[in-house]
């Protein structure tokens, strides 16, 4: 998991010990420690428990790794449609 998530998790845990927080999440301290240290990713169920326990909101965002460009076939179809529209507008 990203550093921002781990830092947020530590901040939300506040002054509670890892032992206490993991008990409230109904998981072992070692499993919680692996999540907080970034050695393991939490399950959706665990994320839901963290949200409930910390009265927070979970935001998931999908960001492409690199810009996606339309396939050449898609560009061709788009160009053909534009040409057809221009032709039909010429007759109006």
Curated annotation (Swiss-Prot):
<dbReference type="InterPro" id="IPR001387">
    <property type="entry name" value="Cro/C1-type_HTH"/>
</dbReference>
<keyword id="KW-0804">Transcription</keyword>
<keyword id="KW-0805">Transcription regulation</keyword>
<dbReference type="GO" id="GO:0006276">
    <property type="term" value="P:plasmid maintenance"/>
</dbReference>
<feature type="domain" description="HTH cro/C1-type">
    <location>
        <begin position="9"/>
        <end position="62"/>
    </location>
</feature>
<dbReference type="GO" id="GO:0003677">
    <property type="term" value="F:DNA binding"/>
</dbReference>
<dbReference type="Pfam" id="PF01381">
    <property type="entry name" value="HTH_3"/>
</dbReference>
<dbReference type="InterPro" id="IPR010982">
    <property type="entry name" value="Lambda_DNA-bd_dom_sf"/>
</dbReference>
<feature type="region of interest" description="Disordered">
    <location>
        <begin position="63"/>
        <end position="92"/>
    </location>
</feature>
<feature type="DNA-binding region" description="H-T-H motif">
    <location>
        <begin position="20"/>
        <end position="39"/>
    </location>
</feature>
<protein>
    <recommendedName>
        <fullName>Plasmid copy control protein CopR</fullName>
    </recommendedName>
</protein>
<keyword id="KW-0238">DNA-binding</keyword>
<comment type="function">
    <text>Involved in copy control of plasmid pIP501.</text>
</comment>
<keyword id="KW-0614">Plasmid</keyword>
<feature type="region of interest" description="Disordered">
    <location>
        <begin position="1"/>
        <end position="40"/>
    </location>
</feature>
<keyword id="KW-0615">Plasmid copy control</keyword>
<feature type="compositionally biased region" description="Basic and acidic residues">
    <location>
        <begin position="1"/>
        <end position="27"/>
    </location>
</feature>
């Amino acid at each position: 998991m990203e550093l921002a998530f781990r830092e947020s998790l530590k901040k939300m845990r506040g002054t509670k010990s890892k032992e206490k927080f993991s008990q409230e999440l109904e998981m072992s301290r070692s499993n919680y420690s692996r999540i907080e240290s970034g050695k393991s990713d939490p399950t959706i169920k665990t994320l839901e428990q963290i949200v409930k326990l910390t009265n927070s909101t979970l935001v998931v965002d999908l960001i492409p790794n690199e810009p996606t460009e339309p396939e050449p076939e898609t560009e061709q179809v788009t160009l053909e449609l534009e040409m057809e529209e221009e032709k039909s507008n010429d007759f109006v």
